[in-house]
């Protein structure tokens, strides 16, 4: 049994994440998805709660045919012990998938196998781009799995993002 670990903020989970996880699913038996910065929500850069992100990811991943875990991981702001923190919050895993330089460095320093998955259309499959499209009324739905769009609709996520992005003129 081989488990892989993949972490992201998933604000929101998008097709770039999904394509990476499809690739990972061909290499491991089980996938652990870590939801980073799990304690932050209702901001322009992190509009969705950990629970909302779990629902998005769960709906999108059901079709992969692999066992997966979705684990919220709050920030601890102590890089020297972060890998130990992650390991204490997740089932054991053998390989880490990431392109984030800090994540790669920390897991490599801890002696873990780290793989850098290909990135897919990063110029459009980007949480920053998708959130901007939501705020501006652009076509963001084509950039996320259908299950994610459904969750965002159910929680009125676009309305929330537009409201919190307004300037305070008081």
UniProtKB/Swiss-Prot annotation:
Belongs to the archaeal NMN adenylyltransferase family. It catalyses: beta-nicotinamide D-ribonucleotide + ATP + H(+) = diphosphate + NAD(+). Pfam families: CTP_transf_like. It comes from the Archaea. Keywords: ATP-binding, Cytoplasm, NAD, Nucleotide-binding, Nucleotidyltransferase, Pyridine nucleotide biosynthesis, Transferase. Pathway: Cofactor biosynthesis; NAD(+) biosynthesis; NAD(+) from nicotinamide D-ribonucleotide: step 1/1. It is found in: Cytoplasm. The keyword Ribonucleoprotein does not apply. It comes from Methanothrix thermoacetophila (strain DSM 6194 / JCM 14653 / NBRC 101360 / PT) (Methanosaeta thermophila). GO terms for molecular function: ATP binding; nicotinamide-nucleotide adenylyltransferase activity. Its EC number is 2.7.7.1. This is Nicotinamide-nucleotide adenylyltransferase. GO terms for cellular component: cytoplasm. PANTHER family: BIFUNCTIONAL NMN ADENYLYLTRANSFERASE_NUDIX HYDROLASE, PHOSPHOPANTETHEINE ADENYLYLTRANSFERASE. One of its GO terms (biological process) is NAD biosynthetic process.
